[in-house]
Design a protein with these regions (language model features):
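Active-site-proximal C-terminal subdomain of hydrolase catalytic domains
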Residues: 156-278
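A domain-level signal for caspase-like cysteine endopeptidase catalytic cores
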Residues: 23-115, 119
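Bacterial N-terminal signal peptides
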Residues: 9-16
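Solvent-exposed loop/turn segments at secondary-structure junctions
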Residues: 34-39, 117-123, 154-161, 181-188
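Bacterial N-terminal signal peptides that target proteins for export
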Residues: 1-7
Length: 278
């Protein structure tokens, strides 16, 4: 997990003994990914690259973390991330994704979560079988334990209403959620995409939203099919006065402890890349 540092609210500068930036001891990563929907009762078509994308999301983080800051070479800053949860296909059940236990191997143990699978108008779609189904924002209180970020590699997670209103029931301590208003598609360039995301956010010290938007512009669906496009988005939790918005934080300015964000949604940002489909 991550250790505490102090964020100076006026200067937005991190104070750490012997180093102007504090390094997290570790980032615990968890993934839920579904390719084989037939094993989950069907109801929708199978996918081809989501399990691989989940693996690449973790291993790309492992390649750049530790040593995220420009002040340190990659691999010199702290312990490597842990892959605390790797649920695939039939393992991605309603009970698994909604479980609020913060013990190892559960969703709320993980600092950063990844979901790769079908989305359906601001909900997760796990399959038509018993024990799967549609997971609504009210079913998945994010951040009751250690979860602080979520990246959804799925269609329409910010479609179907105003994101800050629709996702309000899910924000229970999470800082920010990344996803798409548009359709998203299987992408066999997920290593390049997620490596670009982690490098942008950590080593290049871009904001969370720009790290995601730029990675999608370079290696998202438009890169494979130039006539198409994407609309990625970032939804932040409400932030206290004099604090930078969580979607606009570079990783070096993140408060590296377990303190939950305010249990309210804040600003939503999006970017149209090419010609998205909805």
């Amino acid at each position: 997990m991550m250790i505490r540092n102090i964020l100076a609210s006026l200067s937005i500068a991190v104070l750490a003994i012997g180093n102007p930036h504090a390094y997290p001891i570790s980032m615990d990563i968890g993934t839920f990914s579904i390719d084989d929907y037939s094993g989950n009762g069907g109801g929708i078509g199978n996918l081809g690259f989501m399990v691989g994308a989940a693996q690449n999301f973790f291993w790309a983080a492992n390649a750049i973390l530790p040593g995220y800051s420009l002040l340190a070479a990659p691999g010199t800053g702290s312990a490597s991330p842990t892959f605390a949860l790797d649920a695939r296909n039939t393992q991605v059940t309603m009970s698994a994704i909604t479980n609020t236990s913060s013990g190892y191997g559960n969703r709320e143990y993980c600092d950063f979560l990844f979901y790769g699978g079908h989305g359906l108008n601001s909900s997760f779609y796990l399959g038509a079988g018993a024990g799967y189904g549609q997971v609504l924002p009210a079913n998945i209180p994010l951040g009751t334990g250690y979860n602080r970020w979520l990246l959804t590699n799925s269609c329409s997670m910010f479609n179907g209403g105003t994101p800050a209103i629709v996702w309000q029931p899910a924000f229970k301590g999470i800082k920010a959620m990344l996803g798409f208003k548009s359709f998203a598609f299987d992408n066999n360039l997920s290593w390049e995409l997620f490596n670009e995301f982690w490098v942008n956010w950590t080593y290049r010290e871009q904001s969370l939203l720009n790290s995601f938007f730029d990675a999608q512009a370079n290696y998202g669906y438009k890169h494979l099919y130039p006539g198409k496009g994407l609309e990625p988005g970032c939804l932040s939790a409400e932030v206290p006065p004099m604090r930078i918005d969580y979607c606009r934080e570079a990783f070096k300015y993140v408060n590296h402890d377990y303190t939950a964000a305010t249990a309210n949604t804040g600003y939503y940002y999006s970017k149209v890349i090419g010609s998205p489909q909805y």
